[in-house]
Regions:
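Conserved, structured core segments of small domains
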Residues: 1-96
Length: 96
C-alpha cells in the first residue's frame, strides 16, 4: 500500500539543543535505512518549512502507523496521511 504523508516538525522552543541534535541525527539515520529498504519511497522537503512530503510503501494501515511511531521526531510532528492508488489515466505502471 502506498501512502502520501505530510510531516510537519514542531520542536519546542525550549528544547535542549543537544537533545534536538540527537533526535535529528537519529531521525536521519532511520529515514535513510527505511529509504534503502524501500519502505520510504520518496522524501521531499517543503520549501520554507520544517516539513516534508513523503511516499511510503507498507503492507497495511497498521504498518504505516507503526512506521511513523518509530520515528524519533514522531512526538513533535503533525502528520497528515492519504492512501494512494494508481490513476487509470497514468501512462506508467509504477513510479520506480
Amino acid at each position: 500500500m502506498l501512502f502520501h504523508v505530510k510531516m510537519t516538525v514542531r520542536l519546542p522552543a525550549d528544547m535542549d539543543p543537544e537533545r534536538a541534535a540527537r533526535l535529528k541525527a537519529d531521525e536521519k539515520a532511520l529515514a535513510q535505512r527505511l529509504q534503502r529498504d524501500g519502505t520510504w519511497r520518496h522524501l521531499w522537503r517543503i520549501a520554507g518549512h520544517y516539513a516534508n512530503y513523503s511516499v511510503f510503501d507498507v503492507p497495511s494501515v497498521e504498518a504505516m502507523h507503526e512506521t511513523l511511531m518509530q520515528l524519533p521526531l514522531f512526538p513533535y510532528m503533525d502528520i497528515e496521511i492519504d492512501g494512494l492508488c494508481r490513476h487509470p489515466s497514468s501512462i506508467h505502471d509504477d513510479d520506480r
